[in-house]
A protein has these predicted regions:
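A conserved catalytic-core segment of Leloir-type glycosyltransferases
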Residues: 1-30, 48-113, 173, 182-189
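Conserved donor-binding/catalytic core segment of Leloir-type glycosyltransferases
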Residues: 205-227, 233, 247-248
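Nucleotide-activated donor-binding/catalytic signature segment of Leloir-type glycosyltransferases, i.e.
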Residues: 259-291
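Short alpha-helical segment that forms part of, or immediately flanks, the ligand-binding pocket
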Residues: 290, 313-317, 331-332, 338
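Aromatic "clamp/platform" in nucleotide-sugar-dependent glycosyltransferases that forms part
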Residues: 304
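Short hydrophobic beta-strand element within catalytic cores of glycosyltransferases
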Residues: 312, 321-324, 334, 342
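Conserved acidic donor-binding segment of nucleotide-sugar-dependent glycosyltransferases
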Residues: 336-347, 355-360
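A short, well-ordered alpha-helix in the C-terminal region of glycosyltransferases
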Residues: 355, 362-377, 383-389
Length: 396
C-alpha cells in the first residue's frame, strides 16, 4: 500500500482520490519549499509529511533550508516580531546583513523549480535571486498589524513574488500581488499525532515524571508571554480551590533570554506547588507531546497573541476539549460550546475548566466533535489538495 493510501482510514471519504486526480495534472513538475529550519513549527511538520507523498505521486518535491550567522538570526527574529506587531528597533546594518546573508544562501541553494514556496520571513528576500519559475511567499503568521516601517521594508521583497498565501482571512498585510488562503494542517499519522496505546502513554508520562492520579490540565506551547503561561497558572489556582487537579506546562524556550527568564519563573512556581509540572522539551519531542495531549483531561491554549495555533488542532484530533485564548487562528478552530471554548481572561478560563470538570459527558462530547471538525478541516490531506490546486493555478 502506498503512503497516500495510508490516509484513507483517517481522511474524509473521497479526499485521497481527489488528491490523486490533482496530482496527475502536476506530474513531472518541480516543487521547491524553502524554510529557515527543519525543526519545530507546523510548517516543518507538514513539509516532512507532504514532501514524500508528493514525490510518490510524481511531483518532484524538494526542501531547502537557509542558514546564517548570529547577526543574521538576531535580525531575522526581530524582523519577524515586528511583522507580527511587536515594537522592535531594526538597524539598517542588521537589515543589510539579513539581505546579504540571504544573497549568499541563494548562491548555495538549488533554487531551480517550476514553483518555489518560501516560508515566513527569514528566507523571504531570496526572491531577489529568482531566475525563472513561479514564486510564492507562504506566511504562517498574522501580519495584519505589522509595524509600519518594517512592513514597508519587507514588502519590497514580498511584492516580487507571484502570489502570497496566508493561513486565514484577515492575516494578510497590504500587498500588490494575488493573495490566497490555505489554512495549515497536521499530519494525523506522524509521531506527534499518530495513535499511542494506553500503555505507551503511561510509560512516556512516567518517564517525564507526570503522575496521572488526578485530572490533568495541559498546555503545550513555547514559554513565551504571548502564550500566557502565567495566566494559565492563575486559572489553575482558581480551579484548585474546587477541584484537585494537576497542571502541566510543556514547551521550549529556544534560548531566547526573555523566554528563559519566564521559564525560570515558572520553574520556581513548580517548586512551590507539586501539582504544577513544568517541562522544557526539545523541538523534536513529538512523542512526548503526543502522550501529554492524549493524557490530558482538558487542553489549554491560552494565547493572547497567536499565529494559527496548530497545537489546538493537534489536541482536537486526539479527541480533547480545548480552552483557548481569543487570538489568531484559535478562534477559527474552536467553535464555541461545540469543539471548545475561547476565553479572554483568567477568570473565564478557570470557569470553563470547572464547567468541563463538572460535566464529564459534555467534555467527552466536545472532544468527539472536535476530532471530527479537525478531520474535515485540519488534516494534511486537505492541505495537499490545496497545494496541488495552487500549483495547477500558478502553472496555467
Amino acid at each position: 500500500m502506498s503512503r497516500i493510501d495510508d490516509y484513507r482510514r483517517v481522511a474524509i471519504p473521497g479526499t485521497v482520490d481527489f488528491i490523486l486526480k490533482l496530482a496527475e495534472q502536476a506530474k513531472g513538475r518541480r516543487f521547491l519549499h524553502v524554510t529557515g529550519g527543519r525543526l519545530g513549527g507546523g510548517a516543518a511538520e507538514t513539509l516532512r509529511a507532504a514532501g514524500p507523498i508528493l514525490s510518490e505521486l510524481g511531483v518532484d518535491t524538494r526542501w531547502e533550508v537557509t542558514g546564517g550567522d548570529n547577526a543574521y538570526y538576531t535580525t531575522a527574529r526581530s524582523l519577524q516580531a515586528a511583522l507580527e506587531g511587536a515594537e522592535r528597533v531594526l538597524s539598517e546594518e542588521g537589515l543589510a546583513r539579513w539581505v546579504d546573508m540571504n544573497g549568499l544562501n541563494a548562491k548555495k541553494l538549488d533554487l531551480e523549480a517550476d514553483v518555489t514556496v518560501v516560508h515566513d520571513s527569514q528566507p523571504a528576500s531570496l526572491v531577489s535571486a529568482r531566475d525563472g519559475g513561479r514564486w510564492v511567499w507562504r506566511c504562517h503568521f498574522d501580519c495584519s498589524s505589522a509595524q509600519a516601517g518594517p512592513w514597508a521594508f519587507f514588502r519590497r521583497f514580498v511584492d516580487q513574488y507571484d502570489a502570497a498565501v496566508f493561513p486565514l482571512p484577515g492575516f494578510e498585510g497590504r500587498l500588490g500581488i494575488p493573495m490566497y488562503v490555505v489554512p495549515p494542517s497536521i499530519d494525523p499519522l506522524s509521531e506527534r499525532n499518530g495513535d499511542l496505546t494506553p500503555r505507551e502513554v503511561s510509560e512516556i508520562l512516567m518517564a517525564l515524571g507526570v503522575a496521572r492520579d488526578k485530572p490533568l490540565l495541559v498546555q503545550v506551547a513555547r514559554f513565551a508571554r504571548a502564550h500566557d503561561p502565567l495566566g494559565v497558572v492563575n486559572a489553575y489556582r482558581l480551579v484548585k480551590k474546587h477541584h484537585d487537579v494537576r497542571l502541566v506546562l510543556a514547551g521550549t524556550a529556544d534560548g531566547d533570554p526573555e523566554r528563559l527568564e519566564l521559564l525560570s519563573h515558572l520553574l520556581e512556581v513548580a517548586q512551590e506547588d507539586r501539582d504544577v509540572v513544568v517541562l522544557e522539551l526539545p523541538p523534536e519531542a513529538h512523542r512526548q507531546v503526543n502522550a501529554l495531549q492524549r493524557a490530558a483531561t482538558i487542553v489549554i491554549q491560552k494565547s493572547t497573541r497567536e499565529g494559527f495555533g496548530m497545537m489546538v488542532a493537534e489536541a482536537m484530533w486526539k479527541g480533547k476539549p480545548v480552552i483557548g485564548g481569543f487570538a489568531g487562528g484559535i478562534t477559527a478552530q474552536l467553535i464555541y460550546e461545540v469543539t471548545g471554548y475561547t476565553v479572554n481572561s483568567v477568570e473565564g478560563c478557570a470557569y470553563r475548566i470547572r464547567t468541563l470538570l463538572n460535566d464529564p459527558e459534555l467534555a467527552a462530547k466536545m472532544g468527539q466533535d472536535a476530532r471530527e471538525f479537525a478531520r474535515w478541516h485540519f488534516l494534511i490531506t486537505r492541505n495537499l489538495g490545496d497545494y496541488l490546486a495552487l500549483l495547477a493555478t500558478l502553472l496555467r
